[in-house]
Each structure stands twice: as structure tokens, then as C-alpha cells.
Regions:
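Long, charged alpha-helical interface segments
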Residues: 49-119
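Class I SAM-dependent methyltransferase SAM-binding "motif I" and its flanking Rossmann-like core
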Residues: 29-57
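Short beta-strand segments
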Residues: 10-12, 40-41, 66
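N-terminal glycine-rich phosphate/adenylate-binding segment common to multiple enzyme folds
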Residues: 5-16
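Short phosphate-binding loop-to-helix
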Residues: 1-2
Length: 119
């Protein structure tokens, strides 16, 4: 591994959605192996995470939280409340209300932050 612990992945979304989903799922594997990884797309950033964390944002920023088995999922600094979502779509289309937001839980989840003005 040559001591590399931080990775930014670009070009992982493209013409085939099945390949995109495969690349997104790899983010969780990289995190489990101890890597700090981000996937940068045309519209935002995917960040795999586990347990309680705080994320930089700005008021009005679109945010999605995809649960990968986290328990006790709660949020602070988001428009809509979080819960132990059982389907990926349930945590989509949220919105930050401050310069940061926090996710409180035990377990794994994936954050998507919209960085584009297109949406």
C-alpha cells in the first residue's frame, strides 16, 4: 500500500449505471480497510463514513445519507430527521441548514454532498 491512506476517486461515474453502483460500493470496502476515500462526481462528493461524524456544508446544500446498516441514526443541522433507514432512497434529498451537520449513529453509512449549482 506504500503508506497511502487518502484517495480521491474521479471518473468513476459514466455511461454505465451498473459500473457506477459497483464503484460506489467499493467506497465502503476502502473505508473498512482503513482508507480515507472520496468519490468526486460531476455533481457532488460521496463520502463513506462510520459512527458519529460531523461534515462541512453550507445552508441549502443538498445532502443524502444512505444507510449501510447503521443503528441509532440521528442528525443535527439537517432539514429532515434521520432514522434507521431500511432502503437507500429513504435518506435522499435532505438539506443542510448550517455550516456543518452531524450524523450520530453506530455503524456505516454513505454521505452524498451536492457541490453543483445544477440541482
Amino acid at each position: 500500500s506504500k503508506g497511502i491512506r487518502k484517495i480521491a476517486i474521479v471518473g468513476a461515474t459514466g455511461k454505465r449505471e451498473d459500473h457506477t453502483l459497483g464503484n460506489i460500493s467499493l467506497l465502503m470496502e476502502y473505508m473498512r480497510s482503513g482508507m480515507e476515500v472520496r468519490m468526486i462526481t460531476d455533481y457532488g462528493i460521496f463520502i463513506p463514513a462510520q459512527d458519529t461524524q460531523t461534515f462541512a456544508s453550507h445552508p441549502g446544500q443538498q445532502v443524502s445519507i444512505i444507510n449501510f446498516g447503521a443503528k441509532g441514526l440521528k442528525g443535527k443541522g439537517l432539514v429532515y430527521p434521520l432514522s434507521d433507514f431500511t432502503n437507500w432512497w429513504q435518506g435522499t434529498l435532505n438539506e443542510a441548514i448550517a455550516e456543518e451537520f452531524s450524523i450520530y449513529c453506530t455503524g456505516e453509512y454513505l454521505v452524498f454532498l451536492v457541490i453543483s449549482d445544477y440541482l
